[in-house]
């Protein structure tokens, strides 16, 4: 049967995280091979005859959960009425894999190294449409084909890919392949049904019940060690086998009409072949998948765009710091040395109020503590990702690393919150510690738990098991909270932060502000430039989460992270200076909200992405999308807001420490 690849990918590939990680030849750094296997993922040698100490003869194929670009609900393999493994041990999964809904299980597909098989029968499924149970299974299968659910198979810890040509004769290797496809009642071919003219019957489903698998191997230099697998590719096909007991993989496609009645039999078969590949080494075997990913040139454009913004802001800040501030300080100090210098003006006027405690200082200090926790966690996670420790080959490592770091970073969160709360003149230290421990994490967990209830109700594999929820709560209550208390203890034990100028007892009246120096316009403007640095990367990150594309360019992401920190800092300092010149000394909350407003632009972009890029249907999927988006927005708000506050705090402390004040 003809199986010409479609002109455009029927699905966007397989997700590995907010959600899968690595720097790979995109910026100077480790070569792809060495980067992927830094953690010590040892190669497995294969040979035609089993040699227990040297190599294996049997090749195991594992199946992962199935997902769709048209639904947020993944399902594990056993939820479908496919051929099931009669035996085999389920691989253990780490915390990150469980949180991302990965459910890896043994499959009924068994191979022997270098042994060719043609049209081998795996199993036959029979459905009687008059039986309620059979009809329910068949309907679930049809719905999954309608929503373009994708298989994800794994051989030797490597995805089995379906490679085909897309626009401009580029080859795209999809780490998944569809269950089947659908021809509408108007004769329109959906998704993968465009690959063959044999898929033409109206209001009919075509199931891919046969796969041609080709495994590529590289012979180890020593020879006696056998060979290592370097690629696994397949081509899905559909056959209505004439003789189900002895299939020959020929004939018309396996069609399931929406109007079909009576008995329907589906025989699942496969063919396997092996080919030696001399040009690909085991250490670089992921390259062919990652190099087929599109838009690398856009990443460079993103970096250049961000650097232009940084240079612009750096020039503005440098001009203020070196010219304006330098002149101001010299003038103020010169005026102080003269007898007739009685009148002050500009930002020096508010020196007696600049460190006045802000309103809602408790809440601000709690936000700063949580933001510090997120900031350090993000930096360390991305740093390890750049080194290759959190690569796609190391499944679930990204989320596991992030969660563990967040738990262990309770101490700096408690310390920062306590130090600033004490400097704000706060005395309710118990409330401060409890809020730091439970407020922001509690909001995230409550949202996450509600989303999990929806996933449970829908029977999705992404629903976190009860045992894992208990484990997460144990990490939070038994490790993170005590560490937060320890950090807060040392924070409150230290003296309050010393300010370079004294605070007056009577607050100074703030003069009437122009439109541009009022709080809201400044806050709205402050988030535009930081968002401009990240919006292109944001597109790829959202693609990896919701469109199941593999994300691996962590070199780019780390650079963008550094640029974002610089941009948030400089934009906040710039606006802070203008507000101080307008004699408005309420800088604490304003600095936090100015850079934190970047998260609002993130939310607006996520809404735009949902309506313009995604094909998600269904109430549950929509609620899940926006529920998880709100978690990301909150985390990003705390992250960027904390950067802005620290930058402004440093700036204000610096400028008021170098002027003479009576």
Curated annotation (Swiss-Prot):
Q: Keyword DNA damage, does the record have it?
A: no
- Where does it sit, as one GO cellular component term? Golgi apparatus
Q: Where are the transmembrane segments?
A: 300-320, 374-394, 398-418, 437-457, 466-486, 522-542, 554-574, 591-611, 631-651
Broad class of where this protein is predominantly found? membrane
| Lumenal topological domain | 29-299, 395-397, 458-465, 543-553, 612-630
Q: Which residues lie on this side of the membrane: Cytoplasmic?
A: 321-373, 419-436, 487-521, 575-590, 652-662
The organism's place on the tree of life at top rank? Eukaryota
- Any Gene Ontology biological process: ceramide metabolic process
Role:
In the intracellular compartments, may function as a channel or small molecule transporter.
- The residues the entry assigns to the signal sequence are 1-28
Under PANTHER family, the record lists: TRANSMEMBRANE 9 SUPERFAMILY MEMBER 2, TRANSMEMBRANE 9 SUPERFAMILY PROTEIN
Membrane topology, as annotated, equals: Multi-pass membrane protein
Protein keywords: Cytoplasm, Cytoskeleton, Endosome, Golgi apparatus, Membrane, Signal, Transmembrane, Transmembrane helix
Q: What is this protein called?
A: Transmembrane 9 superfamily member 2
Family the UniProt entry places it in: Belongs to the nonaspanin (TM9SF) (TC 9.A.2) family.
Tell me if Lipoprotein is a UniProt keyword of this record. Answer: no
Q: Which gene encodes it?
A: Tm9sf2
List where in the cell it is found.
Answer: Endosome membrane; Golgi outpost; Cytoplasm, Cytoskeleton, Microtubule organizing center
């Amino acid at each position: 049967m003809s199986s010409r690849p479609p002109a455009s990918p029927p699905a966007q590939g397989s997700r590995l995280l907010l959600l899968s990680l690595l720097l790979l030849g995109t910026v100077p750094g480790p070569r792809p091979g060495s980067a992927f296997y830094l953690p010590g993922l040892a190669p497995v040698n294969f040979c035609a005859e089993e040699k227990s100490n040297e190599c294996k003869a049997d090749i195991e194929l594992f199946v992962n959960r199935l997902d769709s670009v048209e639904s947020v609900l993944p399902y594990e393999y056993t939820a479908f009425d496919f051929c099931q493994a009669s035996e085999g041990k389920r691989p253990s999964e780490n915390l990150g894999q469980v949180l991302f809904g990965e459910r890896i299980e043994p499959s009924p597909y068994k191979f022997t190294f270098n042994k060719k098989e043609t049209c081998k029968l795996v199993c036959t499924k029979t459905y009687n449409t008059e039986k309620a149970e059979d009809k329910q299974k068949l309907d679930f299968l049809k719905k999954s084909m309608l929503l373009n659910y994708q298989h994800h198979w794994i051989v030797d810890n490597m995805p089995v890919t379906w490679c085909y040509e897309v626009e401009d004769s580029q080859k795209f290797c999809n780490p998944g392949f569809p269950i089947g496809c659908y021809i509408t009642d108007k004769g329109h071919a959906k998704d993968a049904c465009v690959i063959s003219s044999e898929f033409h019957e109206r209001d009919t489903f075509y199931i891919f019940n046969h796969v041609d698998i080709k495994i590529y191997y590289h012979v180890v230099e020593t020879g006696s060690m056998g060979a290592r697998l370097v690629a696994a590719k397949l081509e899905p096909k559909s056959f209505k086998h004439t003789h189900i007991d002895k299939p020959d993989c020929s004939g018309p496609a396996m069609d399931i009409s929406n109007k079909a009645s009576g008995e329907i039999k589906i025989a699942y078969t496969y063919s396997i072949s092996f080919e030696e590949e001399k040009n690909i080494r085991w250490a670089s075997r992921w390259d062919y998948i990652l190099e087929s990913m599109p838009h690398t040139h856009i990443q460079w454009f993103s970096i250049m765009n961000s650097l232009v913004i940084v240079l612009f802001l750096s020039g503005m800040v440098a001009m203020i710091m070196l010219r304006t501030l330098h002149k101001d300080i010299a003038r103020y100090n010169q005026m102080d040395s003269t007898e007739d210098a009685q009148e002050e003006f500009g930002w020096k006027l508010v020196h007696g109020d600049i460190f006045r405690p802000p309103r809602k200082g408790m809440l601000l200090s709690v936000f700063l503590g949580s933001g510090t926790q997120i900031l350090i966690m993000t930096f360390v996670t991305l740093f390890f990702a750049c080194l290759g420790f959190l690569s796609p080959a190391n499944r679930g490592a990204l989320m596991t690393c992030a969660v563990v770091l967040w738990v262990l970073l309770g101490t700096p969160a408690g310390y920062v919150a306590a130090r600033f709360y004490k400097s704000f003149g706060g005395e309710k230290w118990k409330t401060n510690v409890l809020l730091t421990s439970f407020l922001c994490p509690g909001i995230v967990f409550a949202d996450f738990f509600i989303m999990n209830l929806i996933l449970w109700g829908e029977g999705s594999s992404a629903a976190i098991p009860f045992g894992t929820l208990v484990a997460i709560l144990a990490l939070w209550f038994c490790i993170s909270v005590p560490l937060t208390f320890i950090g807060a203890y040392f924070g409150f034990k230290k003296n309050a932060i010393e300010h370079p100028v004294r605070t007056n007892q009577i607050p100074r009246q703030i003069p009437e502000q122009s439109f541009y120096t009022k709080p809201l316009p400044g806050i709205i403007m402050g988030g535009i430039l930081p968002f401009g640095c990240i919006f292109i990367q944001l597109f790829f990150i959202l693609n990896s989460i919701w469109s199941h594309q593999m994300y691996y360019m962590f070199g780019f992401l780390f650079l963008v992270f550094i640029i974002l920190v610089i941009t948030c800092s400089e934009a906040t300092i710039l606006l802070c200076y203008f507000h101080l010149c307008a004699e408005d000394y309420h800088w604490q909350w304003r600095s936090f909200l100015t850079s934190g407003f970047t998260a609002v632009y993130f939310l607006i972009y996520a809404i735009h992405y949902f309506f313009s890029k995604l094909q998600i249907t269904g109430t549950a999927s929509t609620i899940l999308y926006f529920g998880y988006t709100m978690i990301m927005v909150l985390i990003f708000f705390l992250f960027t807001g904390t950067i802005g506050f620290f930058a402004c705090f440093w700036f204000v402390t610096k400028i008021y420490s170098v002027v003479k004040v009576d």
